[in-house]
Amino acid sequence: MPIIIPSPWTGKEPQIHQSAFIAPTATIIGDVIIEEGVNVWFGAVIRGDWCTIKIGKNTSIQENVTIHSESNKLVDIGANCIIGHHAMIHGPCVIEDGCLVGIGANAIHNSKLGTGSLLAAGAVLVNKETPPRSLVMGIPATIKKQFPEGSVLEGAKSSGLYAENGKKFKELFEKNPEYSK
């Protein structure tokens, strides 16, 4: 079973939409708001013990992602995003709608990834805002190009597939509770 507990500091409990899939080994603590269709995969840690974390509709938080923030700050992840395996989001931070944060990438400390942007695998975005539809790469991350107006990242389109996959896993664990032990 996932660890879903209130903040020991504030007593605030996670608010998780009933359609969300939370993997049995995920951990969600405190002031966390998870919207419809979100899927939080195995080993992910979302720690809102002294901050607020919002995760928008149909966003995928993949295996071993860590999301946290400085005290009394906000992490705001939009709808239809994919936060790739082993990524770290440390706030205050904003990931706008339709973004893809690549495998092992970091968006930290006053960063803002603009709508429809891609933070490449392994990149580190620190204290920087990017405009919409940016390809952001490197350490420290820099904008390499702008995607055309109206373009949608393939990864962002895939958020719907991850939402469907989350539904299937949710059904599997509900039908077979012994799998969660």
Question: Across the structure, where does each feature detected by a protein language model lie?
Answer:
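N-terminal segments that cap or nucleate solenoid repeat domains
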Residues: P2-V40
